[in-house]
Amino acid sequence: MKKILILLILVLTCLSGICQTNRETIKISKDLELIKISENAFVHVSYSVVPGYGRISANGLILINKSNAFLFDTPWTDSLTMVLVNYLRGHFNLKIAGFIPNHWHSDCMGGLGYLQNQGIKSYASQKTIDIARKKKLPVPSKGFRDSLQLNLGEKVIKCYYLGAAHSLDNIVVWIPSEKILFPGCMVKSLNSSDLGNIADGDIISYTGTIERVIKKFKTAEIVIPGHGQIGGPELLIHTIELVRKQMIKNSLITTFHGSLLTCPVGLFSALI
């Protein structure tokens, strides 16, 4: 079974044809770049030093239709977001029509304050709005419960809350015209060997959420993780494997701790 799964991942990787190194890349600054993934879409990649993790890249999405653009996730900070917006305005003559974050973390909406100062409309899951308000963060303007459909001209943007995973409020964005799925941080790149930071997530619900994503977006060709290289549907399968790995690890830790609690005092003393 494991060999079949590995083969499936390899096949999907080849079929997706997503080799990040072969894509047009625009380096805006040392901490910000754009990667063209379709005629109408770019991934913006920003870098920040995160305590305990080092210098980390984070992915966001830009959908373009004629002279308008929609932003999904900001770079890490207001200052990086300002650089991105100014570049889009200055080099592509684009108007930012709206913004929606994947969830409440700074790698998704760290630049929301700047966008609000610019008068740019913002949308988010109601769960994200509630958390942002509680944590005294900038609060997106308009919320939705289960789903939201927006339009950028004739291009349709579909947003869904399908359950907790990396965070309790994470959503997925689907762009049918481009066959682009942006599940953000709930999905891991193939280079990821673990789930990373899940302190604000739900490991129990994680697999079910990813399975709902797989079932709902069977025609997705481009899948954008929150961090690391872009891929295809194989990223969803890879993430489920990482969740299972984490759950086994958690189970072993729980079992070990439980054994210590029931261990005779004399034996416990000998162990330490």
What are these regions (language model features)?
Residues 40, 63, 73, 88, ...:
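Divalent metal-coordination and catalytic microenvironments
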